[in-house]
Amino acid sequence: MHQFLRAIGFSNITKKQLNEVINNIIDKPEKLKVTKDSEGNEFAELSCDVAPNMGITVRGIYNDDDSFDIDYYYPYFMGSEKTTDEIIDIEKHSEKESYAGVCDDPNLGVTLIFYLQNVCDYLSEKAYINREVRAKGAVLSGLSVDGCILLPMKQKKAKTLNTVDSDKKDRKQLIAEARDGDEGAMESLTMEDIDLYSSITRRIQNEDILSIVTTYFMPYGIESDQYSVLGDIIEFTEEKNIITNEKIYCIKVSCNDIIFSVCINKNDLIGEPMVGRRFKGNIWMQGSICL
């Protein structure tokens, strides 16, 4: 059973109940997309929402007699706005017909990897142009089963904010130059990191780490598309799973200057979300590429 089902309101679902849900999706999908997969099979995505912008997608192959063979399913949560404008490369997972999006966003400082939602769109576009697809941007979202709400940081003065924005812009430029092989930029980034480490080491003697670090975005665990994040809450809504009636928070966060939405079961979130507070949690990153 998929560990992130609880993020969309299926915290106590049994295997029998899940099979019923999946069979209902196959019989009466709300959304159906069909294309040819990498081996020439009639590959299909069948989806149904259980709450606004979230639900379960079943992927598999249609046979010549119109019977459907399930390959796998996964819970999804659709983002609401474009997260990055960077070029996205697509890589196929080895074990099944699923894909990952990969991009280097200078805001994050790490390679961003996410689970691709619109696989049929990607395969159709790839077949149409008869070459590899490099998408320009993606709409990202995260599913979380472990999160908490933190108080906001003390507001900085306008002059300080302007300095911070200028420093961020300079760092992005250095990262871009370093990726192009500029040794001077690499050396500058290394020195910045050493200075930052020294500063944090001094401050952490008397301060809590979460009062020093405003936001962060870093890999979590052994899966390449899972991250530990800390970001400012921009807006949030409370939704309800129409099958289980479990409540789900949809939280839009700003994290390292990128914006994405996270869904989490209300029972898995410690604290009360409010605009201006911070969300801290571990997420499974998904995304739809812009074609």
Give the positions of each predicted feature.
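Long, hydrophobic alpha/beta structural blocks
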Residues: K36-G221
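N-terminal alpha-helical "arm" segments
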Residues: M1-E42
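OB-fold (S1/OB) nucleic-acid-binding surfaces
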Residues: I234-V262
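Short amphipathic beta-strand/extended segments with alternating polar/hydrophobic composition
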Residues: L112-F114, S261-K266
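Eukaryotic intrinsically disordered and solvent-exposed regulatory patches
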Residues: M218, T237-E239, N267
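Short, Lys/Arg- and Gly-enriched loop/turn segments at beta-strand edges
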Residues: W284-L291
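Short coil-to-beta-strand transition motifs
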Residues: Y220-D232, R277
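Short nucleic-acid-contacting surface segments enriched for D/E, G, S/T with interspersed K/R
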Residues: N265-G281
